[in-house]
């Protein structure tokens, strides 16, 4: 029976229940978590997060807010400024590091990103940090360049922390619709993305892109950005997210 036919027999509550089940199915078991706290999901120390995504998606802001949340939970955090293609990227991460009071490892613009990642992990190990968050370049000329750059960074990380990075977090702008799909396609093809952070889901952006991207690429959504404030990065809660579509 199609939904149009079911309209004759089902009320609003029944239809909402069907829609909830459909959305839950699209988000799939990979988004089964109902956590609300920022916590580490592994015993690796340091736990290394490599953050990827295009410039303008909210990558640096997400890193800063993530560092803030982990620090609030009592974790010792180190940032690595491995987006060395833009001076602004290094400067912006420095501002966030100062704001949330965590150390940052950086070099000059044009430096080898893999070298920055190596230095960051060495610093984290020597200082017994719990979490390392590495920023990476958002724009390379093509997918091959992107893949080569990220592969090199990972290879160098392995020399310091054998299984690093433990998480490759792709940051997507939830308000850009089809562009977010294209970015997800590019980055999931270039490296082993295993978590998503979807930003700018406040205002008119309703978050439908979250459902489509998670379903198509089979990568769990881990964080959502719902505003400009430092506290406006949330751990993705599947049931709360689905409920938000049905609030009156």
Predicted regions and their residues:
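Nucleotide/phosphate-binding catalytic cleft detector across ATP-hydrolyzing
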Residues: 1
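Primarily NTPase-proximal linker/entry elements flanking Walker-type ATP/GTP-binding cores
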Residues: 4-82, 89-109, 117-125, 129-134
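Short glycine-rich anion-binding loops that position phosphate/pyrophosphate groups of nucleotides
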Residues: 137-139
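Residue-level signal for short, function-critical loop segments
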Residues: 83-84, 174
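Conserved catalytic-core segment of NTP-binding enzymes
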Residues: 92, 113-127, 141-247
């Amino acid at each position: 029976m199609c939904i149009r036919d079911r309209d004759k027999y089902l009320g609003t509550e029944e239809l909402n229940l069907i829609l909830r089940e459909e959305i839950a199915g699209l988000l799939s078991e990979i988004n089964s978590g109902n956590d609300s706290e920022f916590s580490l999901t592994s015993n690796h120390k340091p736990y290394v997060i490599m953050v990827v995504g295009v410039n303008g998606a909210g990558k640096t802001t997400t890193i800063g807010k993530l560092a803030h949340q982990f620090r609030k939970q009592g974790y010792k955090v180190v940032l690595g400024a491995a987006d060395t293609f833009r001076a602004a990227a290094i400067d912006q991460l420095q501002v966030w590091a100062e704001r949330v009071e965590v150390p940052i490892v950086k070099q000059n613009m044009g430096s080898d990103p893999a070298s920055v990642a190596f230095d960051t992990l060495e610093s984290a190990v020597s200082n017994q940090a719990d979490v390392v968050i590495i920023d990476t370049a958002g724009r390379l000329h093509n997918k091959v360049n992107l893949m080569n750059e990220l592969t090199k960074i990972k290879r160098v990380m392995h020399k310091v922390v054998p299984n690093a990075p433990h998480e490759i977090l792709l940051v997507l702008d939830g308000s850009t619709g089809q562009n977010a799909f294209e970015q997800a396609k590019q980055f999931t093809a270039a490296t082993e993305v295993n978590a998503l952070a979807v930003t700018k889901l406040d205002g008119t952006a309703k978050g439908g892109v979250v459902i489509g991207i998670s379903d198509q690429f089979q990568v769990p959504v881990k964080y959502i950005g719902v505003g400009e404030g430092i506290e406006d990065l949330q751990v993705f809660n599947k049931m709360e997210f689905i409920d938000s579509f049905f609030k009156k």
